[in-house]
Every structure is written in C-alpha cells, then in structure tokens.
C-alpha cells in the first residue's frame, strides 16, 4: 500500500470533497494521473465524487481498472487530510531535490554570489507556485445559501 492509494480510498469512501478540492494531479504519482482525471471528470459531470463502484463501471482502461480494484482492497484508518499532507510533503521534497540537483549540475560554477542567491530564490518561488501551502480561507460548501430565520 502507498500513500496515494490510501488517500484515494479514504476520499472516495468518505466522499470527502473538501480534501479532493485541495488535491492536485501532480501531488500523485504518475500511475495515478489517469485515475485522477477520471475522478475529476465525474465530479464535473455529476457534481459529486464517484464511489469506487461507480469507477469500476465507468472506467474501461484495464490498467486503471486494476488500480481501482487494488485501492478497493486496502484497509485505511487515516484521515484524508493527513494523507493529503503527506502527499504534498513528498511531492514538495522531490521538487526541491530535483531543482537543487539541476542548480548544482548546471549553474553553481558559473554564477556569482548575487546570481546564486537569485537562482535559489527563484527555486523557492517556483515550488510555492506548485504547492498550496495555506488552506483556502472559504469553501463554497460552507457558505450558506440562505440566511437562517
């Protein structure tokens, strides 16, 4: 079992739309991108998260269908929000390491001090753009449509 499988299992079982709305495709391993797209399409079409059973019927791709059956078979007790944080942390760490590796390989010996500092700042800004570091202030799900009597 991996974190992505556990996360998707919990989100779908608990119908946790709040966690799902904070999920980005790039937080998940590439093997899960097709499944992410299918779940997202279902949400846009029906305005709700699919169940695992819905996905078993809707998806025809064998690889993705096998992934759904594997996700369905696991037993998870962790909260979706916590699992999402783990996914974001893992993604962020990989991005930082990849960016620093690229920086060391291509720039470090050719830049002066100011250029090096600016390059490192740019790496931080790029990663901040890719990862939501703060929780959204308001969710449309929490805004009441009508005022209480």
How should each PLM-predicted stretch be described?
Residues 1-90:
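Noncatalytic partner-interaction/assembly domains of nucleic-acid and motor enzyme complexes
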Residues 16-17, 45-48, 93-96, 109, ...:
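Intrinsically disordered or highly flexible coil/loop and linker segments, enriched in small
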Residues 82-113:
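A charged, amphipathic interaction segment
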Residues 47, 56, 71-74, 101, ...:
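Short, flexible coil/linker elements and helix-boundary hinge sites characteristic
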Residues 125-149:
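The Walker A/P-loop phosphate-binding site
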Residues 105-127:
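Non-catalytic interaction/clamp surfaces of large macromolecular machines
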Residues 38, 42, 58, 70, ...:
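Charge-rich, solvent-exposed alpha-helical interaction surfaces
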Residues 80-83, 93, 116-121, 129:
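Terminal low-complexity, poorly structured segments
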């Amino acid at each position: 079992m991996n974190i992505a499988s556990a996360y998707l299992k919990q989100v779908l079982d608990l119908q946790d739309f709040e966690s799902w709305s904070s999920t980005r495709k790039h937080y998940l391993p590439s093997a899960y991108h097709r499944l992410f797209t299918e779940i997202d399409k279902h949400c846009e079409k029906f305005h709700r998260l699919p169940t695992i059973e819905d996905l078993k019927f809707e998806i025809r791709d064998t690889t993705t269908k096998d992934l759904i059956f594997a996700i369905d078979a696991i037993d998870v007790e962790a909260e979706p929000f916590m699992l999402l944080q783990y996914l974001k942390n893992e993604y962020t760490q990989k991005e930082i390491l990849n960016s620093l590796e690229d920086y060391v390989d291509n720039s470090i010996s050719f830049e002066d001090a100011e250029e090096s500092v600016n390059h490192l700042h740019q790496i931080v800004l790029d990663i901040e753009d890719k990862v939501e570091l703060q929780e959204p202030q308001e969710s449309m799900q929490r805004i009441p449509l009508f005022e209480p009597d």
